[in-house]
């Protein structure tokens, strides 16, 4: 029997993230797990001809990063449709469309990504030379016969609450049956019209999740299974390049996304450890008591659910109904979920929501939800069936006062936060909202740490690198003003790295198995482009992985 390690990394600064914050020089992996940490010369002496040896050459190593709210599947989907990035004018956009027409079959749909620069598609149409959106009449000049649809932004990429705009040419409107008599299905949608009352092809939606492409323009089609499969492959590559080795998908995962994960896993291609949460489609549930359904579902989502160290489904997403009619319309596209990847009808009215959460508590089904607005409902369920030790999850935590922090602590909730939104993109806006006297309530990382509440950092897919949230937790700088938002809530670099590693493992109820470089844990790590403990503060956001390893296998290596 071979006793030598499968992999040895030595001559580096290994930031172990163990309880003592140890910095080691080396480690060894065998059969997918760390078998030794420290003592580089002795480890090298144990190597044989089959051992992979990585000379770190002084570089920093961290445990594989764990994204606490990743929406991993979306990243690769951005490449399904042609990009309009770099288009600075309507003429630039028309040139792109014209080129697509030349390579398309007559009458074939031409569907593109939104106008603007990914990932946020910010400052449009002000960023175009004409300071306006193109219309059907513009698009008709280069595509009179092929239907054209420019997709809207997924609102959570931007978070500035400006309308989501999509644009169709005349042929697309004809196929969709949209004319001067068409009325928007909900008040949140505006069908822009010209002076004669005809639609201009421009749709504006005052919402964060598009409705038009799932209703009025459903004829454009959507992501296929192959799109999702290829997109997931590409997403994994992108996230690995930043050192991420695990994701937690707490917003819920619909069957069409789960199918892509399962197929990659069955083929041995899934290299991202993926903890998924069940997304229920309540409109499809039989007319039986909710508790009865939860009893049935418990067999596969209770406790740690079903799966292995690479793919697992456990827990259920719960949320109170908001904008019920809008979500009903989105859900009418079932089983298609678009960018969401979760069911649009996974919300419930308050009384049924509490009933569902009580049934979850009694069946040991972990509840995952979003924002502080859910706290009264969680507390109502807790009064009926205690949840203190069940590690329910509260994601997207943003503004929290001391009383709310205490309530979260007392319920034993685990949290994740998206500093990309609450600090970087919207910090100054939140500061205006709450006032300087309450600044420390904005993503209060230091207070949460001091209260003993676990906080997992998350990207929400904008952008994909967890080093952006790490930097934002440390520096807390607003993108637009450069102001430091609530400086008293800054945390140390080591604390932020813990939020991006071991606290993410705690979120997935797997801290005994991953999240730090310790003997017996899964052999996941990333060799970094610079040392996160000593690089210039503003360089934290630009850190990347030079090598990423999952279970002792290299899954990413920087090529140039």
Predicted features, each with a name:
Residues 3-10, 15, 19-298, 310-356, ...:
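Divalent metal-binding segments
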Residues 28, 192, 306, 527, ...:
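Short, well-ordered beta-strand micro-motif
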Residues 49-50, 270, 306-312, 388-391, ...:
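A short helix-to-beta-strand connector/capping loop
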Residues 264-268, 300-311, 384-387, 408-410:
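Acidic (Asp/Glu)-rich catalytic clusters
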Residues 298-299, 402:
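Alpha-helical scaffolding within the catalytic cores
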Residues 357-370, 374-392, 396-398, 402-409, ...:
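His/Asp/Glu-enriched, well-ordered alpha-helical/loop segment
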Residues 403-404, 556-558:
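Short acidic, Gly/Pro-enriched loop/turn segments at secondary-structure junctions
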């Amino acid at each position: 029997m071979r006793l030598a390690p499968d992999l040895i990394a030595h001559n580096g600064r290994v930031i172990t993230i163990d309880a003592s914050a140890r910095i080691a020089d080396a480690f060894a992996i065998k059969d997918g797990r760390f078998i030794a940490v420290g003592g580089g010369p002795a480890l090298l002496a144990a190597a044989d001809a089959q051992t992979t040896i990585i000379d770190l050459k002084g570089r920093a190593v961290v445990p594989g990063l764990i994204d606490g709210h990743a929406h991993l599947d979306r990243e690769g989907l951005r490449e399904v449709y042609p990009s309009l990035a770099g288009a600075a004018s309507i003429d630039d956009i028309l040139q792109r469309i014209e080129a697509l027409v030349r390579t398309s079959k007559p009458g074939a749909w031409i569907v593109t990504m939104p106008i603007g620069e990914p990932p946020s598609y910010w400052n449009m149409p002000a960023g175009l030379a004409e300071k306006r959106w193109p219309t059907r009449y513009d698009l008709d000049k280069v595509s009179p016969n092929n239907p054209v649809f420019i997709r809207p932004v997924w609102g959570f990429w931007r978070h500035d609450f400006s309308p989501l705009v999509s644009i169709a040419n005349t042929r697309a409107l004809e196929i969709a049956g949209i004319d001067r008599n068409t009325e928007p299905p909900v008040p949140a949608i505006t069908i822009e019209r010209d002076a004669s009352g005809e639609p201009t092809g421009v749709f504006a939606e005052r919402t964060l999740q598009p409705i038009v492409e799932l209703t009025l323009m459903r004829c454009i089609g959507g992501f296929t299974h192959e799109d999702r499969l290829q997109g997931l492959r590409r997403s994994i590559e992108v996230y690995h390049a930043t050192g991420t080795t695990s994701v937690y998908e707490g917003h819920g995962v619909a069957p069409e996304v789960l199918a892509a994960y399962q197929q990659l896993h069955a083929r041995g291609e899934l290299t991202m450890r993926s903890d998924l949460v069940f997304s229920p489609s309540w409109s499809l549930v039989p007319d039986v008591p909710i508790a009865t359904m939860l009893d049935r579902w418990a067999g596969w989502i209770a406790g740690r659910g079903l799966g292995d160290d690479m793919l697992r489904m456990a827990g259920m997403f719960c949320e109170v109904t908001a904008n019920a009619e809008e979500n009903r319309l989105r859900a009418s596209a079932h089983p298609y979920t678009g960018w969401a990847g979760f069911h649009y009808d996974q919300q419930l009215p308050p009384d049924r929501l509490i009933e569902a959460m009580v049934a979850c508590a009694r069946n040991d089904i972990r509840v995952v939800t979003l924002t502080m607005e859910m706290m009264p409902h969680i507390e109502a369920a807790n009064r009926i069936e205690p949840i203190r030790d069940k590690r329910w999850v509260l994601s997207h935590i943003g503004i929290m006062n001391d009383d709310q922090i205490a309530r979260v602590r007392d319920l034993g909730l685990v949290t994740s936060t998206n500093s990309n939104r609450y600090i970087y993109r919207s910090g100054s806006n939140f500061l205006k909202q709450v006032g300087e006297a309450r600044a420390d309530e904005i993503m209060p990382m230091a207070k949460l740490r001091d209260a003993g509440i676990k906080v997992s950092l998350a990207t929400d897919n904008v952008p994909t690198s967890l080093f952006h949230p790490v930097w934002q937790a440390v520096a807390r700088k607003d993108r637009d003003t450069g102001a430091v938002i609530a400086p008293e809530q800054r945390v140390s670099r080591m604390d932020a790295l813990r939020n991006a590693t071991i606290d993410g493992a705690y979120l997935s109820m797997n801290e005994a198995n991953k999240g730090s470089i310790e003997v017996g844990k899964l052999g996941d790590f990333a060799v970094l482009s610079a040392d996160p403990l000593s690089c210039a503060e503003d360089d934290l956001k630009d850190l990347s992985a030079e090598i990423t390893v999952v279970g002792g296998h290299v899954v990413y290596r920087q090529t140039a």
